[in-house]
A protein has these predicted regions:
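Feature captures the catalytic ectodomains and active-site-proximal regions of enzymes
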Residues: 1-358
Length: 358
């Protein structure tokens, strides 16, 4: 098994804790081992590029990111957007914020839920107290209590989504229509001291999933992300500091390496999680049979989520997690088999993300 991600100094959670410590003097998790360079900024801008792992920095259009690279970080497990964004919104590990998968089992509604869209695997809407998903106070609320203003800059059509209501409780939302708007809004908001401006850029992840990393669509997305980073860095007002990172990397999976689970023997199992790390509940003998069939490794998921798991995290996580072999995706019914790139596992390509300084 690949090693557990870092939660004690080299993880995404530690970057967020480091920023909170700089702005307020304290945070629930340790800050970044080795620090983050000079202190003294009045406002911080944090840009998160969805899907821009360290491996993606090898792309021909990623030169500006290579130039800005300060070090690598480790995304939390599982390496998926809703989990990492929950870590950003709380400065907590998944064990503590309780969001444990892309397709997550919520026992209180007896459903496996797509946590990006808050629908079931068949597409039915799931009503829920989205605003109560994350612990209180979250990062944004702690910043407000300290007299600071947290603001998130996002594509405008995300504003009313269940995920936004869950992740950004307590933060001001500023919508943008396109990449140029993202830059303009971020720069304009950073003029005022005492703010944390969090800008989310989805383009790389979307292009990787839909078209693959060798496509022109992916190259276009990489160029757009690079332009956003350069645009913010070149126009950053005095007194503001620019930091960039990602939520996870991407692994390209060939059609022949997608393992569809359709054997009726396994119908009695519950499946959740991600195609690179499938949460499982059911007969231990069947779990062993499934692992042997796909060539994956069954692991205890709780130690991978971080320290001191809450009752919510324990109730939602699988009895076991089946890690997919390198270069493969495990696809039970309800998992999306159409994608070109996946994530959610523990390989370096999925876990290692950049820490960028502008």
């Amino acid at each position: 098994m690949e090693k557990s991600p870092s939660y004690d100094g080299s993880g995404l959670v530690n970057l967020i804790a480091e920023l909170e410590r700089r702005m307020t003097g304290s945070s629930p998790f340790p800050g970044l081992e080795g620090g983050l360079g000079p202190t003294g900024a009045d406002t911080y801008v944090l840009v998160l590029f969805d899907g821009l792992g360290m491996a993606q920095l090898e792309h021909p259009d990623a030169g500006v990111f290579r130039t800005s690279l300060f070090r690598s970080l480790e995304a939390p497990f599982p390496t998926t957007t809703s989990v990492s964004l929950s870590t950003v919104a709380t400065a907590l590990s998944p064990s503590r914020h309780g969001q444990v998968a892309h397709l997550a089992w919520y026992p209180d509604v007896d459903l496996v839920v797509n946590t990006l869209k808050w629908v079931t695997v068949t597409g039915d809407h799931v009503p829920y107290d989205y605003g109560g998903l994350l612990p209180r106070p979250n990062l944004w609320e702690r910043l407000r209590k300290a007299g600071l203003e947290p603001i998130t800059v996002q594509p405008r059509d995300f504003q009313t989504s269940p995920l936004t209501r869950a992740i950004y409780r307590g933060a001001r939302f500023e919508g943008a229509w396109n990449a140029e708007d993202l830059v303009d809004a971020t720069v304009d908001l950073a003029v005022v001291p005492g703010r944390l401006v969090f800008t989310y850029v989805p383009f790389v992840d979307v292009a990787g999933h839909v078209s693959g990393q060798g496509s022109e669509e992916f190259a276009t997305a990489m160029r757009a992300a690079a332009t956003i980073w350069e645009g913010i860095a070149s126009r950053l007002p005095p007194g503001a500091a620019l930091v960039g990172t990602a939520d996870h990397g991407l692994v390209e999976i060939a059609e022949a390496d997608k393992v569809l689970i359709r054997d009726r023997r396994f119908d009695g199992l519950r499946f959740a999680g991600d195609p690179r790390g499938v949460h499982l509940w059911g007969d231990p003998g069947l779990l062993d049979d499934l692992a042997e069939l796909v060539g994956g490794e069954l692991v205890d998921p709780l130690p991978l989520l971080g320290p001191d798991p809450t009752p919510e995290a324990i109730s939602r996580v699988g009895e076991r997690v089946l890690l997919a072999p390198p270069g493969t995706a495990i696809l039970p019914k309800g998992f999306d088999k159409r994608l070109r790139c996946y994530h959610g596992g523990l390989t370096a390509e999925e876990v290692e993300v950049p820490l960028l300084l502008g």
